[in-house]
Structure formats: C-alpha cells, structure tokens
Amino acid sequence: TPVISGVDTGALKEDVSANPQSNELTATGKLDIVDIDTGEGSFVSHGFNKTALQGHYGKLEISQDGSWSYSADNSQTAIQSLGEGEQLTDTIKVTSKDGTTHDVVVTINGTNDKAVIGGSSTGAVTEESQLQTSGSLTVTDVDAGQAHFSNTDIAGTLGTLHLTNSGTWTYDLDNTNPTVQALGKGTTATDTITVHSADGTPHQITITVNGTNDKAIIGGTNSGAVTEESQLQTSGTLTVTDVDTGEAHFSNTDIAGTLGTLHLTDNGTWTYDLDNTNPQVQALGKGATATDTITVNSADGTPHQITIT
C-alpha cells in the first residue's frame, strides 16, 4: 500500500477567489506518493475535459505527479447562497496507480452579498396637522436567510421611524421639536434615517417635514388717548413672539383709521396722529369721546387691535 501525503485540502472564498474573466473559483495543491512497488508511485491523471473528476460543486484535475487543481463555478446558487461565516465542502477521491484512493477536500467559504433594497423610501408629514407617514421596503438577498429587516425603532433628528422585519415602516413626527415648530408655512425640513437589512446593507429613508403657520403672540401697549385741539398724538410699543423662524416682527406701515393715522415700525413701536380736521372729531363736545380701532398684523399675518380713545 502506498503512502500518500502532501497538500490534500484547499480553501476558496465565494466571489473573492473568482477569476474575473471566467468567474471560476480555483484551488491548487500537490500530493506526494511513496510506493515500494516498482512503477506504481504515481497517480491516475485526469484533465479538465471529459475525464475530469467531478465533485458536488466543482471538478478536479490531477496529474501523474500529484499536482491537482480544483475549479468551481462561482455563480452556482449553492455558492451564492452562502453568507459570511458559512461554508460548503467538496470531497473528491483521487486514485494512485495501484488503485489506492485518497480524498482531496476543498472548503468553499461564503461571503456577504449585499442586499438589494427597494420600495418606498420617502414620506411627508406636516407640522401640527399630519404627524405620521408610512411606507414599505422590499429586500432581496442571494445569501440564504438574509432577505429581511429587524423590528427596530430608529430615532431621527425630527422624529422616530418604526421598522418591521417585513420592511413596513411608520414615521412619527415629534411635533414638539423646536426645529419643527420653527418651520413657517411654505418652508420644509428633512429627516434622513438609515435602516439596515439583516446582512447590514444600509438604505436611507427621507422624510420631508412641511411647516405651517404658528400664530404669533402679540402683547404690549395696545391703547392710547388723544384730545381734540390740544393733544393730537399718542404712542406705544407692541411686543411679538413667534416660534416660526423670522416672523417675530411687524412691517413699517401707515394705517389709516377713521379719525387718524397709525404709524407702525417693524420693531412694534407705534404712533397715532389724530386728524383734528375730521368733522367727527370737531363734533365732539367736552366730556364726549369717540374711538378709533385699528388692526395691525405681525409678519405672519396675525391680527391685533390698537384702540385709540
């Protein structure tokens, strides 16, 4: 009986070890043989043709001197289905000149094939009124058991995305977020959240947050008094706060009332000039009063009344 030694194992890695032209995975080695019987210290040769030794996933060529080469088609479903850390083995028997057999064992190691993710990747919500949007992702992955997601909640900058293992997702807007409340009508913000399939392939879901008009809060001096003939002017200052960015102000404007004119500045200071020639003013007797109510508006259109006696 001959003694067979040498390299009788090989290792391949899905995709990584593949020839870029042929997409074949290959491994090589050399067996040694010692046989005391004259003329039998060699192997039965097989080439990569009809006489190649066929394994379960590939084929093996061996020469008389023990040099062998193993080749497998990298595109096979069984190989492409391997994930990182998974493996297949292909055991092929070679034969020496006297009929003694020996196993050559080739291990095919898997690698992570990136998933392909599609479906609904965008959504829209609106401050105050529409706080939720939803969609569904699709995922395909040639690696067995990896065509799915995990149930998870992912915090974005403006809300939270809830993802199920089947790919359906729901986004809840945090309506109390200062950035959200600062959005005015016609302005938008985006919240981009990255999700991952089971194998770690990333995919982005982008949510558009539409702003709405938050009414300003107006305070300060909203009344004044003038007197026919003697005191024809009065003034005051309004205050304004508005969570919508850039809207906490007024506009420089002159507003005609029924008995005079109000002059308003952008910072809220106002002056009222009585039209002393107005017949209604001149018709007032001592102890009699009239009122002139004038409506002003902040930058976002919030109305406020100033009443002059």
At which residue positions do the language-model features occur?
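Extracellular ectodomain surface segments
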Residues: 3-54, 116-157, 217-258
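Acidic, turn/loop-rich segments in luminal/extracellular domains of secretory-pathway
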Residues: 52-109, 128, 154-210, 229, ...
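Proline-centered linker/hinge motifs at extracellular inter-domain junctions
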Residues: 1-4, 8, 66, 112-117, ...
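Acidic active-site catalytic centers that drive phospho-/nucleotidyl reactions
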Residues: 35-37, 90, 98, 113, ...
